[in-house]
Amino acid sequence: MDKFLNNRWAVKIIALLFALLLYVAVNSNQAPTPKKPGESFFPTSTTDEATLTDIPVKAYYDDENYVVTGVPQTVNVTIKGSTSAVKKARQTKNFEIYADMEHLKTGTHKVELKAKNVSDGLTISINPSVTTVTIQERTTKSFPVEVEYYNKSKMKKGYSPEQPIVSPKNVQITGSKNVIDNISLVKASVNLENADETIEKEAKVTVYDKDGNALPVDVEPSVIKITVPVTSPSKKVPFKIERTGSLPDGVSIANIESSPSEVTVYGSQDVLDSLEFIDGVSLDLSKINKDSDIEADIPLPDGVKKISPSKVTLHIEVDSEADQKFENVPIKTVGLSSSQNIEFLDPESQAIDVTAKGSPTNINKLKKSDIELYVNVSDLEDGEHSVKLEVNGPQNVTWSLGRKNAKIKLTSKKSNTSTNDNSSNTSGNQDTDKQTNDQKNNQQEDTKNTDKNNNDQNQDGNKDQNQDQDEDESTANSQSSSE
C-alpha cells in the first residue's frame, strides 16, 4: 500500500478522479441544458445579429468623364457574428458599402453592392443588394442666376426693392446631358421681411426643371453674393424753371420743353406728402441766342434723400422778336377784404396799355383776354396806397407796362353806408359796391389763373416782374410766369 501511494502517477490519477467527482457534484444541482445535435458538451462563445440602417453607399466610377444616376444614397445592412464583434461593428461602422462601376461604359447596368473592410468573424447582407444605374457622359454648361424675392409684402411701409446685383451673374452647372437639357430655372432666394435698407447676403443656388423639381447637379459656385438696393417711399413731382438774365436784343423764346417733365423724389412719407413741386431749376437767358439743348441740375429739397434723374434737358426754341400793344387792359384786384371798398385814383379808368413782346408765333396767338393785370391789396389798411402792377400771361412772353404803380384808396364799407344820404353818393356807393363785387370775382379768377399759370407744362413758375420806371412815362418789363 505504501508502495502504491509513493508512486507519483498513482497520486496524479487519484487527484484527477477527485476533481471529476467534485465537478459532477457541483453540477448535479442544476437542471441539465439540452444539447443540440452535434453541439459540444463543453461551453462555446455566443453569437449575435443586428440590422444597421441608413448606411451610406460609395460609388466608384470615372467621375471626370461620366455622371451616374441610380446609386442609392443609403442601404440597410444586417451583420452576424460574435456578440463582441457585432457590438463593435455597430459602434464603429468601420466597414464600407460600395458600387464598383469603374469598368462600365455609358448605358444602363445592374450593379451588385458590396462590402469591404469587414471584421473577421462577421458576415454582412445588404438590402438592396443590387441596383440599376445609368451612366452618361458628363456635361458642363453656364446658366444665369435669377433672384427670387419672398415676403415682399412684409417690407416696411413704402419701401421697395430695386434690381438686384448678383456676383457672379452666371454659374457652371455639371450633370448628365439629359438633366442639363431639362434645366428650366436657376435661382437664389432673398427674404425681404422688414427690409428698410440695402440687403447684402450670400444665397444658395438651386436648379429646377420645368415642373419645379430640384435637379441633382453640381453647381459652381454653389453660393453667390446678392445685393438688393432698397428704396424709400417715392413720388413723381413737376419742377419749375427759374429764368435769370435777359435775352439778347431781337431774340425771343418760342418754346421750352423739358425731358423728362417730372422727376421722382425719395424720402420719408411726411416729406413726400408736403412736396408738390421742385423750385430752383435755373435757366440763364443771357446765354441763349439760338435753338439749344441745355442740361439743368435738379436741386435737392430739404428732407429728400434722392432725386431721379438728378439732371433734366431743356430744349429751347428761339425766334425773332415781335411786339403788340393792347390798349386799356383792365386792372383787377387780388386780396381785397370783404369789409373794404376800393377806388382807383390813378388811373381812374382802372385800365392801362400793355405791350407784349415775344416770337411772332406767340404774339399772333395772343389775345387781350389772355393778359391778367392786377394789384395785390392783401393786408392793406384803409387809406390811400401806391401798389405795384403785376401781370400774368402766356409763357415765353415779356410785358411792357405804361406805368409801374397804381394809386388806390381803400375804405371801410360801414363808414360809406352811414355817412352818405344824397342820391349822388348813393349812386356812387352802388357803383363802388358793384366794383367791389367785380373785384372779388376778379380776385377769384386771378387766383385760379395764377394757380393755372404756376403749373404749365414746363413747370416754369416765375411770375412777371416789372422793371422800375418813371410813374408817368417809364416802361416796365417783366418776364411772364408759365401757365
From Swiss-Prot:
Domain of life: Bacteria
Localization of this protein: Cell membrane
Classification lineage: Bacteria, Bacillati, Bacillota, Bacilli, Bacillales
Domain YbbR-like: 55-135, 143-228, 237-316, 329-394
Induction summary: Constitutively expressed, part of the cdaA-cdaR-glmM-glmS operon.
Name of one Pfam family that matches: YbbR
Residues spanning the membrane: 9-26
Chaperone as UniProt keyword: no
GO CC, any one term: plasma membrane
Phenotype caused by lack of the gene: No visible phenotype.
Keyword Repeat: yes
Keywords: Cell membrane, Membrane, Repeat, Transmembrane, Transmembrane helix
Record note on quaternary structure: Interacts with CdaA.
PANTHER family, alphabetized: CDAA REGULATORY PROTEIN CDAR
Protein name per its UniProtKB record: CdaA regulatory protein CdaR
GO biological process: positive regulation of adenylate cyclase activity
Coiled-coil region list: none
Cross-referenced InterPro entries: c-di-AMP_regulator (IPR053154), YbbR (IPR012505)
Gene name in the database record: cdaR
Low complexity: bias regions: 413-430
Chief location: membrane
Its membrane topology: Single-pass membrane protein
Stretch list, region Disordered: 410-483
